[in-house]
Regions:
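Soluble N-terminal domains of membrane-associated systems
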Residues: 1-99
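Solvent-exposed, non-transmembrane amphipathic alpha-helical segments
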Residues: 42, 66, 80, 84-87, ...
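Glycine-centered flexibility motif
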Residues: 41, 80-83, 89, 112, ...
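Membrane-embedded alpha-helical modules
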Residues: 125, 129, 136-183
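Extended aliphatic helical segments
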Residues: 21, 31, 49, 76-77, ...
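Short membrane-interface loop/juxtamembrane segments of multi-pass integral membrane proteins
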Residues: 89, 94-113, 175-183
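Transmembrane alpha-helical segments and their cytosolic interface motifs
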Residues: 101-136
Length: 183
């Protein structure tokens, strides 16, 4: 992750935090409930951010509650939203006037579009193509069929899962800086 940190121009502290967020965002879909969908995974992803940014128990609990709301998007591209919300949480911790409700508003407004893009690319197209290749091998009893499917699918999905949280963080940080400078 240090190479990615350098590529995005992050200091070591922010780079380590974003590495945790990127790794944890892989598990966004691990606990899926019909009440809040991926909220548990989203909260799991944001816990290192909340713990780092806020000192008091009250602030941390408020942060946990803020991120344990309905969340449902494509798990491959959803990391962008976690990165963006990380930048917003960092700004909120620095600026007591920051409207923390905007963090949830941004998350909620991006869930649908990212689900549409991610599902179209990964679930409806790329998965079907790679599954077809894997199945064509497996139908003749070739053990490489499922392996080829997993390798091919993740050749595209894994870089997105790793890099998109950084992209979201960088874009969010840039936006927060511009907003702060413009007043």
């Amino acid at each position: 992750y240090s190479m990615i940190r350098e590529k995005f121009g992050l200091n070591e502290e922010d780079g380590k935090l974003m590495a945790k967020v990127a790794r944890r965002s892989h598990q966004i879909n691990a606990v899926y409930t019909w009440e809040k969908f991926q909220a548990m995974g989203y909260l799991w992803t944001m816990i290192p951010v909340i713990n780092k940014m806020y000192d008091t128990e009250e602030e941390r609990i408020a942060g946990y509650k803020r991120h344990y709301e309905l969340f449902n998007t494509n798990p491959v591209v959803g990391g962008f939203i976690t990165g963006l919300n990380t930048a917003m949480e960092m700004q909120a911790a620095k600026d007591k006037e920051f409207d923390k409700a905007s963090i949830a508003a941004v998350r909620t407004s991006l869930m649908g579009p990212f689900a549409g893009i991610g599902d179209s690319i990964f679930q409806s197209t790329w998965r079907v193509i790679t599954m077809g290749i894997g199945l064509s091998l497996a139908k003749d009893g070739n053990i490489l069929g499922p392996i080829v499917f997993l390798v091919l699918f993740n050749l595209l999905a894994e870089p997105c899962r790793i890099l998109l949280p950084y992209v979201g963080f960088k874009m969010g940080s840039k936006f927060m800086l511009q907003a702060e400078e413009s007043g």
